[in-house]
Amino acid sequence: MKRIDPVAQEILRHAFHGVAEEMAVVEYRSSFSPIIREMLDFSCGLFDARGRMIAHSEMIPAQLGLMQFTLAGVLDALGPLAPGDAALANHPYLGGTHLPDLQIFTPVHAGGRLIGYAGSIAHHIDVGGATAGSENAENTELYQEGLIFPPVLLVERGRRNRSLWDLIRANVRDPDATAGDLEAQLSACRRGGERLVELCARHGRATVVGGMEGLLEGTSRRARAEFRSWPRTAVEAEGFLDDDGVTFGRPVRIHARVQVHRGALVVDVSGSSPQVRSSVNVPWASTHAAAYFAVRCFVGAEIPQNDGLTRHVRIVCPEGSILRPAFPAAVSARHLTVQRLSEVLCRALGELLPDRAVASSHVSFPAFVFQAVDPRSGRLALLTDILGGGGGARPGAPGDHAIDSYTSNCALLPAEVAEIEYPFRIERTELVRGSGGAGAQPGGLGLRRDYRLLADAAEGMYYLEQLDRRFGSAGVAGGGPGGPAVVRIRRDGGPWRTIRRGKGYLHLRRGDVVSFAAAGGGGYGAPPRG
């Protein structure tokens, strides 16, 4: 392996990251569904020939680092990909997340030799299953949640697998959008491959391959040094989901014990609840992604995000846990639990490194998918939206308002786009006054949005956390907790009715208004007196 001088290594490091970011721009500009092109629920990455992550676009932290788990499954099943191949996978028990997150990988060859892979993961608006959007917290097994793809070739040596494309189109609710978004992913991967080949032409193939290895080894050294500088004390934290979505009112525990051991960070989540009958179980790869995100928040910015860092994060968890469920447990609403796990881990690391601690951000994650026939076109429309809540306050600054916190980072769907694309009118989008936790620095405010149905009927699932005040966003150093999330509905022009269940299925009629409000963030420091 060719050794690279430090200057060339830094040039290549930033070049790899730039390629991943350019892939994301291509996908953003060519995607069909608003959940990708407006809400930015996708990520792109580069990997070496062994499938190790080299660089990742800065999009969705929940997808941070987990693509290499899926790529490992692809390579185990299919072997090294040939020129012109494109592999597709989404199996949650073979390195995937939940079924709507379709992942595509393409090989990159230079001078006749495999040098790496380009990959894209994107949340598709629908992949079939029992409910619109292929998500429902009340699901009890994976088979209800849509098409399951073990690693399979979507394109083989440049020729499309038409039977597979036809199968996909026949089983999803919006086939044009799904096919268009798959094309966008292929375009992103193609651009990534082109740019890597250009780097080889400019610097030489051996230099680029050596730069990948040097980047990972350099990151690994920095990561070990960082973790060795941390206290060896074991710290613990826990948090709760309001319930699992099936058994109303029974909290679900997420517990973590964190300790540095021999230059690695050991994250023990064995104390968490067993897997549940609903879909808030977390695939093993997503559990790792939550841990990688929390670590990313506490390590120095000079340490890149790649396999050199993540290899030093070790997770302990028995199979059968909510954070390591056994097949075929449902997982479509796994992000609710991933959010809480991320918050718990950040709180634990804040105990370990108090000078870097901040108050907790909301983990309410108000999200829903409604399907309705649009009277303007006669076509089925699938509205997906995710609302931001309050961010945690920190020393010297209040919490941010209306952010999609921790591992999510989706953008808010613009009201104008929602009203053009779907038979809904957005009647209110506003900050919830008083929802931030009290403190010397107050927590951020949650966001409320009201939707009026303009079609004859609509149905769909919704879910959100932190309706239970006991599990509000925690304050730090005397700061108060954030306010709760709220769901309301108003029918036939009558009064607002509060819905107590945070996860469920709604049937709407023309003129109904449904309102979701996210929780606020925790405050930092004791609030001023008087």
Model-identified regions with their sequence ranges:
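Glycine/proline-enriched, intrinsically flexible loops and inter-domain linkers
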Residues: M1-P83, L88-A110, L114-G530
